[in-house]
Amino acid sequence: MKKISNSLNQKIKKFIQIIFKLIYGNINHDIKKISSEKIKISETKILKKISNEGYKVCEISKGRIYTDFVENVAVIEKHTILEPFSYQTYDGKYLPYSENTCVKKGTPRIKKYFKGNILNLTQGASGHSNYFHWLFDILPKIKIFSELHDLSSIDYFYLDNLKPYQKNILKLMGLENINIISANKHRHIQADKIFATEHPWYFKGLILEEVNNMPDWIIEWLNEKFLKFANNFNAGENIYIDRSESSFKHCQFKNENEISRFLLNKGFVKYKVGNLSFEDQIFLFNNAKVIFGAHGAAFANLIFCKKDTKVIEVKPEYHPNKISKKIAKINKLDLSLIETKELQNKENGDIELDINILNNLL
């Protein structure tokens, strides 16, 4: 019965896709079909990729955007997907733009037209609420755009509905008056003008590996832009980042109670960083002398640390993300990265840390 139900659902989806293709047309990836009259592409001169090339920013008259809100975003001129400005991944791996879902399935959502100018900032699930990707993916797109265009010309950001911390950060940037179009509610949009930038650092391969090639300017700009907003409070100088608040099960200590008792006896103060305001997080990391914790989004705040801050980060050896090394190199931090063996039973955590190793590093 379940197989019949799944088969029926697939047939219904196929039928819906056919109907929407009749309405909005097929999507191709043939750049020869792009109208040079409706699209303008400019390139940054100061901000550079890791390859030392500038970033491209496009401006499309009557352009469209389609997203599945998970792994695909298509920036479209008439019926052609634009390669550098679209985004498509599968299982954490970047795909050729010819494999964007809209090339195969079309744009099976009712199109909503917006009068005015839209800057596309959405890139799928990773950019919706994750603190790290908000700082290192979404905000740099705004910076890239602002090198070539005036932000006051933008009427809308195309994103998901903002979390409180995201609203706060945009307010700190003086961008609180720009309207937000929910990419979840409006999966298919068109506007008088669509603007889109290339991704700040992800152009190929696995995202957890490519993050290690992030250009220096992103880290330096975030520090310069936001450090001044640090909110002074009675924070400990030796801090333990508690990840138990995270909805993710990876990078969690199996022997959390043992580690916690050991560190509290050493004078550490435990913080659930996600419960702090952005301004408090800035101060917490800038004020710290020693930081310990399991790998997670909170370590994005290393961008605010002072030179020579001692950082001890722990992660499973199979986890490839080493962005902390990049930040530590630029900010001249004293980073110790502990990589633990894979556990057979990860039900109550995937990291078991030998206290003796930690004690030797403190």
Residue ranges and their predicted role:
Residues 1-362:
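The feature primarily captures lumenal catalytic ectodomains
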